[in-house]
């Protein structure tokens, strides 16, 4: 077979025509060629094959609205807002409040009474009641909110809507250098980051796959929901009003999506991540009424993983947290301390706190809570619950919320804390999965460093610039925040020097 040989001028002309065609049709060349083939086939069939005129199905009529290029994304954002609003406020908050204020307290009282009746020591009673039950109970209390969230997400997945969102978002993601294939792991990530990272195997191009692995955990997973609910549903709800609580939860989901897009734009303009996104072709299934059995099974599978982690990793974490917050040095002796400011966890937090001071939460309590989040994100809530219960009445949610609110001088500080723990490195299990999927020590450590530096920079800008706008606060770190903002804007809007670079996969896709 003879090959066509083109000179440099012909190649330049063809390349220019290709770019003009992609701009005019608002699509990539592979998709344009594929669409042209199907259009031509349809044209031939229409003149040679006779068949009754097909009527639009109900699915087709719905798709004309929910996959519309103008209405598709606003409808998706509205649906996700309603899902998170209902899950974290309204019904979710009512059940969670009952769990925290009645169920967990009743268990603490019953266990405490039983231990007293059998003559258990005060130390053992404190470990079990305050450390384990108090810490794990602080997380278990948010299980109803998680169950409601998983219920809504499972219904949307089973009815066929979620798969269409990947199709709708393909146009948006392609503009930012990714394809709709990268959005599928993000959808999965709303349940758990581990399967989201593993879902990146379906992405053929290595650079897009690495980028998706690095950013998939930016989407709030089920483990992060208690953290969002704590700061939004408890602190904002008890202290600042339920209006703020209802806004924070869905806002964090949108923050995660925006964080993914911003990171994608910046990284795609660097050589290691450059190249065009792979074409995204998928078959949309018919809409159908969700199966109650399937939906409930999905909810249970997601919730079971959370409960198992609460009964294993969190129990150990709560014991360690209780020990570190109960023991320390007072005077020259080591032992149980009455003031947690003299505890071991306070010493560790105080040592690291200056690093986080520019973010607005430079106190040992919030820093210690963030550090425990690297073992499991739910441990943040456990730590905050244990530390808040020491200073206040653990049976009074208002006192606990007020105690935690004192750790954050302003609302911007609490928001900064929330965003940092949303975007920083995930839990140890997800980190282990990242290492396995990247299969390269260099890329693994780059991913870890990028996630934490990125989270730090975003939180720094949120707190410093937000404080300047709302409170008129200005200082050295405000200047640093504007420098970081200027650098990110430069990376976002500079021309892409590697836009037309072709990238080939060097790794086969595993089933």
Predicted stretch roles:
Residues 32, 90-132, 176, 197-212, ...:
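Extended, low-charge hydrophobic alpha-helical regions
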Residues 1-52:
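Alpha-helical transmembrane helix bundles of large polytopic membrane transport and channel proteins
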Residues 222-249, 432-438, 457-475:
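Transmembrane helix-loop junctions at the membrane interface of multipass transporters and ion channels
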Residues 75-86, 149-154, 232-235, 252-268, ...:
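Hydrophobic core segments of alpha-helical transmembrane domains in multi-pass membrane transport
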